[in-house]
Design a protein with these regions (language model features):
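Histidine/acidic residue-rich metal-binding segments in metalloenzymes
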Residues: 131-141, 145, 162-209
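N-terminal hydrophobic targeting/anchoring segments and the immediately downstream early-domain regions
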Residues: 1-166
Length: 212
């Protein structure tokens, strides 16, 4: 059975905030912002499961995201990606009576059919994969079905809306997009440069998402 889902949000940074909560930032406002996130069940952020429990049918893409400025010394963006994924899995396990991780439309239907929220995974900024085509297979195995090539910063795939907006997809970025499509990972054009956006529209054979 295919369910109509009236509440389907394509982007949130909740996992990032849960992962970063407890970091001893020197800036008290920054520390308070992240510490307020708590966990997925009850959060001071925009999304938590207690509030979402009021929705009849609800699906949510959770972004794996990290700001390069917040990567701890001695860590790396790919390592942060692993830790974020682990935090996502932990939240799914601790809240399995309310939410189920989903990889396919059929699994989304199954989750909402059980009266639970459906959780899907995205990656915001390919830096979490070191912009490495070979790491896309790992992301797919994690359950990632939506990916932003860039966040605020230009990278080896494309310029961003905030940095090098005239730079479209690089040759490597076009190869990266092709591999995403082979894996059935949708491209999210949010934060892309204007030139990169039009390159994606021209080259993509699958629907394109602008989540925010």
């Amino acid at each position: 059975m295919i369910h109509t889902i009236p509440y389907f949000d394509a982007h949130c940074d909740t996992i990032h905030r849960c992962h970063t909560a407890g970091t001893p930032f020197r800036d008290p406002e920054l520390r308070a912002f992240y510490d307020a996130a708590g966990d997925l069940r009850r959060s001071g952020g925009h999304i938590d499961l207690e509030r979402a429990g009021g929705f009849s049918r609800y699906a949510q893409f959770f972004a794996l995201y990290q700001s390069p400025r917040l990567v701890p010394e001695g860590s790396s963006m790919p390592e942060q990606g692993v830790l974020l994924h682990q935090r996502f899995l932990r939240e799914m396990e601790e809240n399995r009576e309310r939410i189920l991780p989903c990889r396919t439309g059929a699994e989304v239907d199954e989750a909402v059919g059980q009266g639970k929220a459906a959780a899907l995974l995205s990656i915001e900024g390919a830096e979490l994969l070191d912009c490495d085509i070979r790491r896309l297979d790992t992301a797919y195995d994690w359950g990632v079905r939506l990916l932003n090539p860039v966040w605020n910063y230009a990278n080896r795939l494309s310029g961003s809306n905030a940095q090098q907006p005239e730079q479209g997809l690089t040759a490597y970025g076009r190869d990266f997009l092709q591999r995403m499509e082979e894996l059935s990972i949708y491209v999210d054009v949010s934060h892309l440069s204007d030139a990169g956006f039009w390159d994606v529209v021209r080259l993509s054979r699958r629907p394109v998402v602008a989540s925010h």
